[in-house]
Design a protein with these regions (language model features):
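Acidic/polar, solvent-exposed loop/turn segments
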Residues: 1-294
Length: 294
């Protein structure tokens, strides 16, 4: 009942003819803390960036993506009302005892961090807890996120998709004390990557009558969502579609006898004979579109 009490035990022993002996002992009880209040907390949202996944992302930064990396630090607050607790993060069980966070008997710190398995697109690592119940963690995005039909509740940055926030991962949090249970979730958003077309230039300013080949430089990166990416080149009414296999792009199209080839970053567009000997002055425009996998 949370009160300090005095307990008195009095014992009397009486023999067969009425003689007796009597003694008493007094015990003072001191009330300990009561943990009847239910815990609360356990939720947070963090943002990562697909464009900064090492070896995958386009690294193309905008005002919306500049502050974010593939790895991000986050935290959530627990209110335990002084009680010890069992904390489950993504199914990994930790203990709070005397204001410190433990995993398998070892205090969780930056030097003794705990990895939480089960991430769909990255890894979650718990790195410690402050005295006020704030749990710290790091999430690292390791694989691209399909943005198709997967928009987060936060605005994007236009039709290209770069900077669009998409849902990447979620880890359930359960906090249990003698006062009850609280549930929360660590939610991870990823800023969608987009292709970058860095160079499109020709090595010729004019093409002589009868000359079929137009050469130049084309360089681009599909970004993190490279799987399923496509490149199209539209020129002189023809559309060439590029697909990548074994590290090389191959273009098909050109129903009029024309062709488009890309060797590394060097391209060659070969005009059909009907366009090279018609005696007209022409303007040749190449329009290149790079579309990533989502």
């Amino acid at each position: 009942d949370g009160r300090n009490d005095t307990i008195t035990l009095q014992v009397t022993v009486t023999d067969g003819d009425g003689d007796f002996a009597q003694q008493s002992v007094t015990v003072n009880t001191v009330a300990g803390p009561l943990f009847n209040d239910a815990p609360s907390g356990g939720s947070s949202v963090v943002t990562t960036d697909e464009g900064n996944i090492p070896g995958m992302g386009s690294q193309h930064e905008t005002s919306a993506t500049q502050p974010f990396g593939a790895a991000t630090d986050g935290s959530f607050k627990m209110e335990l009302h002084g009680a010890d607790a069992t904390v489950s993060i993504g199914g990994t069980e930790l203990k709070v005892e005397n204001g410190k966070l433990y995993h398998n008997g070892v205090e969780v710190t930056a030097d003794a961090a705990v990895s939480v398995p089960g991430g769909a697109h990255g890894t979650l690592t718990v790195t410690g807890m402050d005295a006020d119940g704030t749990v710290h963690y790091t999430y690292t995005l390791t694989t691209p996120v399909d943005a198709t039909g997967n928009a987060s509740n936060r605005p994007g940055e236009g039709d290209t998709g770069r900077g669009e926030a998409v849902h990447a991962d979620a880890f359930d949090v359960t906090i249990t004390t003698t006062g009850g249970t609280a549930t929360g979730q660590i939610t991870v958003d990823a800023l969608d990557d987009a292709p970058v077309l860095s160079t499109l230039d020709t090595t010729q300013t004019t093409v002589a009558d009868g000359e079929a080949a137009l050469t130049g430089t084309l360089s681009f990166t599909p970004g993190a969502d490279a799987e399923g990416a496509q490149v199209t080149v539209e020129v002189e009414g023809q559309t060439f579609t590029g697909t990548k296999a074994n590290g090389e792009w191959t273009f098909t199209g050109g129903s009029d006898g024309s062709s488009f080839q890309l060797n590394g970053t060097a391209f060659t567009y070969t005009r059909p004979s009907s366009n090279t000997t018609d005696g007209r002055n022409d303007t040749i425009t190449l329009q290149v579109t790079v579309t990533d996998g989502d």
